[in-house]
Structure formats: structure tokens, C-alpha cells
Amino acid sequence: MYQTTAALRSAFLEFFRSNGHQVVDSSSLVPGNDPTLLFTNAGMNQFKDVFLGMDKRSYTRATTAQRCVRAGGKHNDLDNVGYTARHHTFFEMLGNFSFGDYFKEDAIRFGWTFLTEVLMLPKERLCVTIYQTDDEAFEIWNKKIGVAAENIIRIGDNKGAPYASDNFWQMGDTGPCGPCTEIFYDHGDHIWGGRPGSPEEDGDRFIEIWNIVFMQYNRQASGEMLPLPKPSVDTGMGIERIAAIMQGVHSNYEIDIFRALIAKAAEIIGVADLSNKSLRVIADHIRSCAFLVADGVMPSNEGRGYVLRRIIRRAVRHGNKLGATEAFFYKLVPTLIDVMGDAAKGLAETQVIVEKALKAEEEQFARTLERGLGILDSALNELQGDTLDGETVFKLYDTYGFPVDLTADVCRERNIIVDEAGFEAAMAEQRSRAQAAGNFGADYNAALKIDAETAFCGYSELTGNAKVTALYLNGESVPAINTGDDAVVVLDVTPFYAESGGQVGDKGVLMAQGIEFTVNDTQKFGQASGHKGTLTAGSLSVGQVLEAKVDKKLRHRTQLNHSVTHLLHAALRQVLGTHVTQKGSLVDPERLRFDFSHFEAVKPFELKQVEELVNTQIRRNHELKVAEMAIDEAKEKGAMALFGEKYDSQVRVVTMGDFSIELCGGTHVGRTGDIGLFKITSEGGIAAGVRRIEAVTGAAAMAYVAQQQAELEEAASLLKADAHSVVTKLKVQLDKMKQLEKEMQQLKDKLAAAASADLAGDAVVVNGVNVLIKKLEGVEAGALRGLQDELKQKLKSAIIVLGVAQEGKVNLIAGVSNDLIAKIKAGELVAMVATQVGGKGGGRPDMAQAGGSQPENLDAALSQVLPWITERLA
């Protein structure tokens, strides 16, 4: 009756709904309230604050079908996926929860009733485990449910410490915890394995299908277990495992969802054997990758994006192993949406973006995959022993984008071990080099440790009196500074904004009678604001009172750029999709720079839409509203928060009409109309999956438009056209140029043919082979290839090396007729010559080109060619 996975999901949620539970939608795979968690990996994640007593819901009973990912971090199943029957990067966790409502008896009864009366599982196939001292759970199972005592297994502290047990759950070293009971299904004695707690428990005969956690204690730092005033329940049942039982199969990869995905992958790639483990990997990985992108994660080189990249690249590698010759992974998304049913609603809404993101990442990796696999294969073939060295693993990672687990995956198939310690050492060395390069010329003030606090009054005031609480000169705390000293001044209160959130620090002046300190920058040092600059007049001591004056013009221009950054972020999410998230920003008086996640270059028409959308919001002249509120309230209102940023419990929320709402501590305009004009000046990629937009506002935007207009008028003048006909006139000129280039090439080809007739006579015969080695004068580098082709046709069986030196550069070409490439390859030949002229190159066995930077060495390099060829033709 409930054999399909979709039917199981519906039956579970309906059973608990009918028993007074609120059906709650699956939360995002990106945890919204837990910065310690990489991905949502359990049903209880979205209720963590409820269990901790920090949040209250309108219900005390809940049920969910939660999407989960376990890949990266502490919970990482990636290495085992495809090789075992039950490991997945993505799974659905069915769960029911009680927040101080029902407890052990009802929780156990609900689970047993659903399994034996709704799903009709045979009771004799089930056994349960409990924590060794949980007599209450034993009594419920034995006396009230009727499970025989021999089928109730007590599990003790089997992990080497008190309460460290498979049957005792803990959120952390302190906090809510408690015993749990697990329900196991017996697949039968035809499968190897023993009951839980037995020496053979790791076998596949007895499979855990449901875990019921009783949160009844609050563990103290001392280790003492105090009873919780309101015990709660957290349960979880993996839908894939229960689906396998209901569908009469032993492996999760044989259930309906995976059968459909495996069949589709095999069809796309062209594979007949549906039992191939690589198909399992691909079927699993499309689920995690598609849902992660749908929840806003984009492939990148850090954090969640890097885990996603690793999973995609592992799937692509397995497709390559099966013979895939073009992008295939993204083509599985429609099948995934179909088989996931109601659980894929959000995925269906973002299908186009998901497919584009997966395809872009696959195509990018495909460009280096073959070369990387070739290097790995060569390294493994030459390996002495059973361990691949860390340097090679690092080279594959650094040069070809091979995550270490992908390399390990290939090695595993050949029973080779990866030297992970060596890889980590190479990584550490690279980080040290990068850090050393980054620290070159570093400001000594960056290391200041200031034990003081500075209150900020600069949201409403740009001037004010303040007392000097500390002075720093050459990185040391001093009581006073003198004229000409470059120093850091710390005040008790300041209108100067200290650099934060991408907004640069304010500039201005600190003044008193006979004293003037020019502030060139303002930086945060812990809770203090450091005013960095030069004392241009007088002397200054700790305790003196100064007038602090921010440069109003610079602050105003910075505010224009900061406010428009919020509008830009919102516009990008509207035009490109909600997967767009801020990756970095710079806001200064001259311009703004905004880095964001996106999987491809922003198209010109999309940039135009973004620009028009921002300018529309500027013209609407929204009032900027700023409010302080609890972080959870801000998120409920839809405020954008930056991943990785740490926020206090109270946050500052900046709202612009109904268009933009963000958490922000920066300074802003009063109304969007103050911005005046917004103009994008550039868009480009700065890293895989990260794009950058630079733009200007206000007077700078007007100046940029005026400059463009002036350049347009100058171009029109050169073309003898007006501004409206520049494009038409330019097209005419380009067409003429193409025709002239075509005619010029035809003339060059004729000259090359004539020259080849003369050159062919200079060939020498070595062991019956025509060999031509020539330095050419007055020949353009672009003509070398055509000349080489002509010479090959004339000389038939031949080896040709031609070189040209011009404008401080060397250009080389080598050609080898097909009958000789078994003995001599053009790529090796041209590389040998190139190394002697300060260059490198390569190509096909029959034709290869190279360049160099040492034309003075060309004659000597060419003189080495004949002996090199003679030796190989002997």
C-alpha cells in the first residue's frame, strides 16, 4: 500500500497530523539559526532553539520530512557513497517532535503503531535497543507494547566514557541530552550480521530504521545530569531505509527514486550495466547538488560552496569513467523533480537556475579533467608501493581542481592509499607563502591590541567633543605625541565610522586650541575605534578633549555608494535569482565594488535590467528606515544576513521601501533619491562562481556618463558620422576590414607557397628522411603554419623545424609527417628547441608550435635539432 517513497512520506506526515502534530515544511539545507553547522543534517536542526528554551512555537507537537546533507565537516558520508548500500550525501529524515508535551510512552507507542499497524511490518522482524539504565523505556516496551524481553537490548557506554553510547544522545559537552531507543529491522538470516550489541552488529542483517531520543537531562560542565523541567522528544527515520524495506529490496539504491535516477543517468551516458557503482554515485550526488543549489549554495572555493563543488566534480569524474563525452549531470534534474514529488516543490521553482549552475560547473571542470586524470594515471602507473605522495595530490588539487577526496576515490579503485598528511603539509606551505606575500608591507597598527571601548555617535552627528583615552606610536602605547608623529588616537566617543562591513573608515580632523590631528583612516581594534593619521600641529596627551570633525563630503559620497549597494544586491537577486549572495564588498567615496555568487558571466541585457531596476528605486525616493530588533525577528522579516558574519542578539536593520531589507551597521542616505544616479562601470569574474560589479553614483555617475558621451562623439567624428549613426558606420568599416584581411591572407598564402618551393631545396636527407631546419627572415609568425603545410606536401616524408625572431620574441613550428611520428613527435621536438630560447610549447604529434623570449639564442637552438633528429632516426 505504501510502497513508493512519495506514498511513505505522505503516510508518515498524515499519521502524525492525525495525532495532533503540526506538519512543518522541511527547512533549508543551509541552517538559518546555527552558524556552527555547515548543512542541515538532522530533523531537529530547525527546532534547536525550541529544545534549548530560546524559542517558542505555536505548537508543542511537530512532524517533518526534512531534507539533509552529510558531506564535509564532522558528518561526512562522501567517501562511502556508491560503495555501500546505505551511505548518501543527501537523505530525507522523517521525524516527530514533542516540545515538553508527550514523552517516552507516547513516543514509543507512536513509532510502534506506525510501523506495525500503518506499514504492517511483521512484529517478529523488529527488535529494539535502549540505554543500559533506562528501565522506564524497558517497562514501556515490554509491559505496554508487548515486545519480548529478549528483543529489548540494553546498550551501555560503548564509546569509552560515561554516557558515551550509541543509545545516549548529547547536543554537546553541556546542555540537553538523554537516552534513546532505536528500532531495528531484521532482513533475515540469508544476510550476514548480528543483533545490535553483538560482535557481528556491523553486518547488514539488522538495520536501524527509527531513533527516538528522550531529552530529559541538562548536562552541567561538571558532568552532573539535572532533570529538564519539560522533557522533550526528537525522533528520526531515514525514508530511504524504510522505503527499501517496504519495496522488498536490501540496498537503498534499489528503491524507486534511485532506480529512476540510475536508469536516466545510464540512458544519457549510454551505459547498459545498471549495477555499475558509478551510476549509484551519480544518482546520489544529483540529489544533494540540485537541492543545495536550490537552497542558494553555489559552487565556490570556500565553505559550503566548496563542498558542493567537490560533490559535483566527483559525479562528473564518475560520468567520465563511464564514457560521458559531454555535460550530462544537469540533465538529471527533471527526473529528480519528478521522482521527489511534493518534496521537490522548491527545486521545481528554481529548476532553470539549478540546471545552469550544474552545467556551468561541469563544463568548467571538464576542461581540466582529462589532463588531470592523465597525470594521475601516469603517477599511479609509475608508483613504487601502495601510497600516492602528497605533492602529486596537491598538484592535482592546485593545478587541475581535483579535490583530495576525488583523487582518493580514483586511488581507492586501484587499492592505492593517499598520503593525506603530505597533502596537508603542501597545503600548509602554500598558505604560508600566500600569507607572507599578503603581509608584505603590512601596517604595524594591524597588530595593535587596544583594551578600551569607543562609543559611536556618527549615525546622527558628524562633529562632537571627545576625550583621548589612548595614544599609540610605532605600535606602542604612549602618554603623548608631538608634531609630525604618525599615530593612532583612541577616543571615548566618536562620530568617525570605523571600517566595517565593506565601508571604509572615515577621514577628517581632530582639533583643539593649537592642536590639529589629520585623520587618514579609522579602524576597529576590538571594541575601540582607532583614528589613524598625523599630528600636524601642537602636541597631544591622553586625557585631553578634542573636537572630532568628519569630512562631510567624503562621508556623504560613501553613504551614496553604501545605500546603493543594498539596492544592487536586491536587484541582482530579482534579475538573476535568489541564489545570489554577497561574497564581499568595498564602499568608498569614489566607487563601490560588489562581489556575489553566480555561476556565469552576467549577460549585457541582465546588467541593463539590474541598472534600470536600481535607478527605478532611486527615483521612487524611498525613505531609509533603520530599526534595532532581535536577530530572529529580523530574519522573519526577510532581512538579508551574510554567511560567516557574527551578529549580536540585537541587530540593526536597514529597509528601503519593500525592495530591500538587510542587516547593516553602516551609514546611509536619508532617502534613495539622494543617490541621484547609479551606473555600472564593469562586470567580471574574480574566482570560480564569484562575479564582481563595480559602479559609481551621484556626481561620479554623471561624470562617467559625460565621459562616455564625449568618447562617443569623438568616435563619431573619426567615422565622419553623428552619434546616432556610429554603429552603422562602424559595421561598414569592419566589413571592409574583414574583406581586406581575407585578401591579404590569400596573398600571404601565395607567398608562402612560393617560398616553400625555394625552401624545399634546402632539405637534407638523414637515414632516408627529408629534414628541413630553417631560420626565416621577413616572415610573419602567422604565416608559419601555412608554410609548414606547404613544405609537408612538397617533401612528403619529412621533419620540418622553422623559426622566426622578431620584436624580441621567437616563434617556432615543428612538423612531422604521419609515417614518422612513431619515432619523432612534433610536440617533443618543438619543446626541446623552445627550452633553449626561454620558452615552452607543445601540440599534436604531427604539428606543434612554441614561443620564446630569447631571440639571440635561436641560431644555437636550431643547430641542436639535426643531432637530436639523427639520434632518433638511427
From Swiss-Prot:
Q: Where in the cell is it found?
A: Cytoplasm
Record note on cofactor: Binds 1 zinc ion per subunit.
Q: Name one GO molecular function term.
A: alanine-tRNA ligase activity
What Enzyme Commission number(s) appear in the record? Answer: 6.1.1.7
Q: Which NCBIfam families match?
A: alaS (TIGR00344)
- What HAMAP family does the annotation carry? Ala_tRNA_synth_B (MF_00036_B)
- Residues that coordinate or bind Zn(2+): 562, 566, 664, 668
What's this protein's function? Catalyzes the attachment of alanine to tRNA(Ala) in a two-step reaction: alanine is first activated by ATP to form Ala-AMP and then transferred to the acceptor end of tRNA(Ala). Also edits incorrectly charged Ser-tRNA(Ala) and Gly-tRNA(Ala) via its editing domain.
**What does the record give as cofactor?**
Zn(2+)
Q: Which GO terms describe its biological process?
A: alanyl-tRNA aminoacylation; negative regulation of DNA-templated transcription
Q: Name one GO cellular component term.
A: cytosol
The transmembrane residues are none
Primary localization class, coarse? cytoplasm
What reaction does this enzyme carry out catalytically?
tRNA(Ala) + L-alanine + ATP = L-alanyl-tRNA(Ala) + AMP + diphosphate
Signal peptide coordinates: none
What is this protein's record name?
Answer: Alanine--tRNA ligase
Q: Which gene does this sequence derive from?
A: alaS
Q: Which Gene3D superfamilies match?
A: 2.40.30.130, 3.10.310.40, 3.30.54.20, 6.10.250.550, Bira Bifunctional Protein, Domain 2, Threonyl-trna Synthetase, Chain A, domain 2
Its UniProt domain note says:
Consists of three domains; the N-terminal catalytic domain, the editing domain and the C-terminal C-Ala domain. The editing domain removes incorrectly charged amino acids, while the C-Ala domain, along with tRNA(Ala), serves as a bridge to cooperatively bring together the editing and aminoacylation centers thus stimulating deacylation of misacylated tRNAs.
Top-level division of the source organism's lineage: Bacteria
The similarity annotation says:
Belongs to the class-II aminoacyl-tRNA synthetase family.
Organism taxonomic ancestry: Bacteria, Pseudomonadati, Pseudomonadota, Gammaproteobacteria, Alteromonadales
| CDD domains for the chain | AlaRS_core
Instruction: Write the record's keywords in alphabetical order, separated by commas.
Output: Aminoacyl-tRNA synthetase, ATP-binding, Cytoplasm, Ligase, Metal-binding, Nucleotide-binding, Protein biosynthesis, RNA-binding, tRNA-binding, Zinc
Which cysteines are cross-linked by disulfides?
Answer: none
